[in-house]
Amino acid sequence: IIDEEDITLTDEEEKKLQEEKRLIFSTSLANPTKAKIIGDMDSVPYEYYDTVLELINNFISGKNASGELKRLKSNKKLVGFMELKYDQVRIVFKHIKNNIYNVVGVFTKKANNDMTMYQTMANRMIPDVTTEEKLNKQLELGEITLKQLTDLVEVKRRKGTR
């Protein structure tokens, strides 16, 4: 079981989290232009698609509700990782630098996948942003991924009335 730690933030940290953020996304070496989160969405039930997009958009703009943001702490591999959560949705991410965060992936929490999914997320590659050029490329891919995710949600989400 993963321990979730309530974040006790300093005023400065709180202010930083409310600033606009930029996202990059974990990919694989085999396909460095396809973000893992897009593939992860295949295993997320359609009724949670809006939640995934809303959590991410609120995070970017610094408007997440209390309790939606948690640090992960129980496992050495997960040190430094955080999650956005609402209902069963978990979006795992890591702060890279300044206002840049790496989204590792998304899953829906179930009793039988808890540890496995956190381990999977912890083992994913964090993109190389050691140079300005690499960082800019990742930020560009991040914008493309956000558009792909938005389009995916628009097409596949479950409508409230049928």
Predicted regions and their residues:
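Basic, Lys/Arg-enriched alpha-helical interface segments
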Residues: 1-88, 96-101, 107-162
